C-alpha cells in the first residue's frame, strides 16, 4: 500500500509543485488587463464526505493568495464575465513553499459586451467584482456640464419626472465615499461633471450583512461618487432669477461646500409663482400648482464627518445641524359640484364656490448624529423642532338644489365667512443603539413626538331659505387648544442561527396621550352642543417574529405581528358624557418570497393580512351641529376591517436585447369597509353624515412595463395597467325610507401608455399616446352608469445646436363620459423654451412660454357608490417668462 501511494505521489509530482501557499492573478482574456475585485472560491476535500472552503477577493492588481494543501478546486467569478474553474494540488511539508498558478483569464459575457461602448480609447465602464465603475472622461459632455447631465447618460440610469434616480428599474441614492451625500440629490445639478473622478454603481449591503456576511435581504442600490482631490473643500451652487408675465417673479440661491469632513449647505428662495421649496439636512421638498401664492425662505446646514481605523475597518461618524425660516402666503378661488344619489332616479345637487387665503411663518431646526465608537456599536440620534404661526380667511357660498323632475330647483343658500388664527409647536426625536456580534445584532431604540397647538375661529353664517324667502344670521366663535404625546420605545434582535437561517424578533410599545378641548359660542352665548372635551389614552404592545431563510437563489421571509391594544377615551359634549374603553388583540401574518433568477432577473411574491379598526371617537354616539346644514355624528356599531393582499412581481433587465420588463399583479379582499353614509331631510334641507359598515371591497391590478432599445437611436416604452374592483356604499337616505339601500359599484379600468423615443446627436424626440378608460356600473343607481375617458397624446422635441437648446411639448387631453359638460372637453397644452448657454456654460438664459393656447382648466372629478363630485381651482398658467441661472464653480487647487 505504501509503495502504491509513493508511486501515485511521484506521478503527480511530474505535473505539480509541492506547496501550501497558492497565488495567482485574474485578468481579462481579451485586453489582458487585471481584474481587481474578482472572487476566488476554493473548495478542499477533507474526507470522502466532508469539505472545507473559503473565498478571497483579488486585490487592486488582480492578485490573490491563500493557504491550503492537498487537492483544491478553484472557481473564479466576476460580474459581467463567465466563470472559470481550475483544479490545483499542493503537497508540501513546508509552510514557506509557494505555488504560483499564473494568470486566470476570464472572458467577458455577451451581455456585458453589448453594454460596453468605447469613446476614443477610454472605456465607459469597467467591472470590479460586483461593482460597475463608470469613467466620466469617456462620456461626451459640453464644457461646464453639470453632474446630472453625466448621470443621465450612464447606461441603465434614468431620472423620472420628480428627479428621482433609477438604476435598471430600482431606486438608487447618491453617496460620496460610501456615505450619504450632504445636500442630497440637489447637489448633482450644481457640481460640475469634471469634478468627478469616477462613479461606482453597486448594491450596498446592510450593516448586518457587513458584520455577519449573510444576506438579510436588505440592500440599497447606490451611485457612489469619487471626487477629484482638487475639487474638494470648495463651494458650488446655482443662482437663478426669473420673471413671468403678469408680474410674477422667482429667485433662489443654492450653495454647497463639498467636503469629506465639513460640508455646508446654504439655501435662499423668494417667489410669487406658488412654488414651495424647503431644504434642510436630508430633506428637500418642492411643490407648486396649488392655487396662487408667494414664499420667502432661507435655510442652512453644517455637518462634521470624522473617521478612525480599527483593524481593517474604517469607522465613519458624523453630526449635523440645519435650520431655516420660511414665510408662505397662499390664495385661491375654487369650486365644487356635488351630486348625491337618492333611491330611484332622484338626486340632489349642490354647488360651492369659495376663496381662501392663508399666511404661515415656519421656523425649523434639525439635528442628527451617527457615532461608531467601535466596529460593533452604532449610536444614532435625530431631532426636529418646528413651529408654525398661521392665520387664514375664507369665503364660501353653497347653493343646494333638488331634482324636481324638470331639472334642479334651488332650495337654500349658505354664505360662510371664516377668520382663523393659530399656532403649533412640534418636537420629534428618535434614537437607537445597535450592537453587532458575530451572528447578529441587538438594537434598542425609541422615539418621542410632542405637539402643542391652539386655534381660534370666527365664523359668520348667512342662511337663506328660497321657499320661505327668509334669512338667518349666525355668529360663531371657537377656541380649540390641543396637545398630543407619542412614545415609541422598541427593541430588535436578529440572529443567524445557521449560515442560511436568520431569526428576528421585535418588540414595540406605543403610548398615546391626546387632549383636545373646544369652547364654542353662538351669537355670544355659550353653545354646549358644539363645545366638547376629549381625552384619549392608548397603550399598545406589538411583538413581531420573523425569519430570513436563504435556499440557493431563493429567499423566504415569513413574519407575524401580534398586537394587543387598549384605548381609553373620555368624551363630554352637551348632555353626552361618556367613557369608552376598547381592548383588542390582533395577529397580522405576512410572507415574502424572493427568487433571484439571475443578477438581472428576480421574482417576488408577497402576502399580508391586516386588521384596521375605526377610530374610537367614531364609535361614540356624538353629534356635531357646528354647521347647521351639515351634521356629523358617530356610530357605536362600526366593525373592524380585515384585508388579505396577494402580490407577485417580476423584474428583468436583458442587456443583450436592450430590454427591461416589469410585471406586477395584486389582488386585495376586505370583509368590511367603513364609509360615510348621508341622510337628507327635504323639509329642513339638512344633511347628516354618519359612518357605516358595508360589505368589503374586492380589488385587482395587473401592470406590465416594457422598455426596449431599438438599435442605437430608438427606444420603445409601454406601460399597461388593468385595474378593477367591487365597492359598496349607501344611497342618500330620505325620511320616507325605513332603511338604507346598499349600492354596489363595479369598476374596470384599463390604462395604457405607449411612447416612442428618438435620441441621436443633437436631436431628442418622443411621441406618445395614452388610453385611460374607467367603466363604472351601479346596481341601484343605473342612471349613473358611465364610462369615463381620460385620453391624451402628444409629442416632445429637443434640439441642441452649439450653445442653444430648443424644446417644445404638445399634448392633447380628451375627457368624455362625465355628467358635467365642463369636464367633457378637449384641452391642447403647448409649451416652448429656448436656452442660451453663456459664460462657458457656467450660465444660461432661458426664454419660455407655458400653456400658450390658454387651455389648462385644472378640473378633476371623483365618483363613488353614493356621490359624484367635480372640482376646479385657480392655478398659474398661460404665461411667458425669462430666467438667468449662474453656476458657481470652484477652481481646482
Where on the chain are the PLM-derived regions?
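Signature of Gram-negative outer-membrane beta-barrel scaffolds
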Residues: 502-602, 779, 784
